């Protein structure tokens, strides 16, 4: 898989070798591609079907062989999120993370078709960014009960119950529009906009570690 370039056009994923030759292709004409990630030596592609962007297939990157699939309700528009340990999707409504066998380990946000009530603590919030590294999932979101604030939340990527988030810390950033820019195993950094923008870092216990001035976002 080393050196392969993965592209998508006209319903086809194409893996290209460094010398420009075609390694393999994967075609799917019945659904549009929503997101594309890589992890564990696999290509992970999510497609839009009758359950939103919830039809996901894992393909061996080196050979193009089918590995596994999963299908579940998801948002209509998503972006990929990944680390060496997890792959998933993020939308303004929800976050889903999966391990290498495509079993979901995190379900967070406004979850449709809930099997049990009262599992999600912040269903009415709007997610603005998310990043993950090993056992750390960080996200930012805004909530209607506290306008003008961005919440930075840390949670475990392997909670006891994938349907019930394990929130490690909630950080109240008193600025609208803050976004994650980096994540570590036990910390994260956010860009805080305003007249004097800053990059602020916090550990996963919610303690501020550092704050440095930054250029305004374009």
What is each residue range found by the language model?
Residues 38, 62-88, 194-218:
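Contiguous hydrophobic segments
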Residues 56-64, 149-160, 199-206:
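Beta-propeller blade signature
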Residues 1-3, 11-34, 65-74, 102-115, ...:
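Aromatic (tryptophan-biased) beta-strands that constitute blades/sheets of beta-rich domains
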Residues 159-214:
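Acidic, glycine-rich loop-and-beta core segments that form the ion-binding/anion-interacting portion
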Residues 1-2, 28-41, 72-85, 115-130, ...:
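Repeated scaffold domains used in trafficking and secretory/extracellular systems
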Residues 85-175, 183:
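Solenoidal tandem-repeat scaffolds enriched in leucines and small polar residues
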Residues 2-9, 14, 36-52, 56-57, ...:
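Short beta-strand elements that form the blades of beta-propeller/WD-repeat-like
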């Amino acid at each position: 898989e080393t050196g392969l370039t993965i592209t998508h056009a006209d319903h086809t994923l194409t893996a290209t070798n460094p010398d420009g030759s075609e390694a393999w292709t994967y075609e799917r004409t019945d659904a549009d591609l929503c997101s594309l990630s890589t992890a564990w030596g696999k290509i992970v592609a999510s497609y839009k079907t009758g359950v939103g962007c919830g039809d996901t297939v894992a393909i061996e990157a080196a050979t193009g062989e089918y590995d596994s699939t999963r299908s579940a309700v998801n948002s209509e528009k998503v972006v990929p999120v990944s680390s060496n340990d997890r792959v998933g999707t993020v939308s303004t409504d929800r976050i889903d993370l999966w391990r290498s066998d495509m079993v979901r380990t995190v379900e967070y946000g406004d979850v449709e078709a809930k099997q049990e009530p009262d599992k999600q603590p912040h269903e009415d919030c709007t997610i603005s960014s998310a990043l993950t590294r090993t056992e750390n999932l960080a996200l930012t979101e805004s909530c209607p009960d506290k306008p003008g604030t961005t919440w930075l939340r840390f949670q475990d990527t392997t909670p006891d119950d994938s349907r019930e988030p394990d929130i490690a810390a909630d950080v109240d950033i008193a600025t609208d529009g803050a976004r994650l820019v980096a994540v570590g195993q036990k910390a994260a950094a956010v860009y805080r906009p305003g007249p004097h923008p800053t990059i602020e870092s916090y550990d996963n216990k919610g303690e501020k570690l550092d704050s440095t001035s930054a250029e305004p976002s374009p």
